[in-house]
Amino acid sequence: MSKIQSFGSGVYELELTVPVRSTKFQPGQFLHLTLDDFDPTSGWWPESRVFSIASEPKQTFVTIVYSVKGNYTKRMEDELVVGKKIWIKLPYGDFVIQEKDTPLVLVAGGTGVSPYWPFLLKPRETGAVHLFYGVREENHILFFDKIQILKSQKWFHLHLMVENGSVKDLPYKAGRLSVSEIKNELGEKFDLADFYLSGPPVMIKTFKNDLTSLGIMDSKVHIDEWE
């Protein structure tokens, strides 16, 4: 464990140095993390939790973000300190963001923004990527510095929704993120876009149903589901 950053309200960013030359995964995939001892010769993997990878591939570290919501993540909050050695395994998942000629709409609620960063940090010159990001308040905005850098890129379009309070140095709207808000912002591009959904399960279910009701085909809606 090389870095721990707290965002308040039980939300943390962790940076883990890995004992390999570089990490290999595709943007959108996740890893398993366990707090318990693991013997690679036993073939038995202990209890663990899964977290989206928020750093770029081919690095000597991986970054994840988690929110304290149960006994295991409470253990993480209590037990993880800089310098502690823990076991992870990766990569997993098929929530892989594909480059397309059509607009890409990345929808994130809270820590659900994490799997998008390996994709957003890739250099690109063309295309249109819309990040619709909903948070409760300013201090819950993850990767604030990276967003500030990206907002100057012509291909990147930030749509930040904040439920409480105001935000300095980033454009935002007050309120809760919704499919109707996304449709209003995209206009005629709405029917052409591919949608990626990441966030709390209730949010994902609601957004998926709302997109379907507006005529968006299932093949154009991609959900961050961990199995």
Question: Across the structure, where does each feature detected by a protein language model lie?
Answer:
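Conserved beta-strand elements of the Class I
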Residues: 103-107, 196
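Short, conserved phosphate/pyrophosphate- and ester-handling motifs at nucleotide-, phospho-/glycolipid
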Residues: 28, 112, 200
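Histidine-anchored nucleotide/phosphate-binding helix
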Residues: 113-124
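Reductase modules of NAD(P)H-dependent flavoproteins
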Residues: 132, 137-227
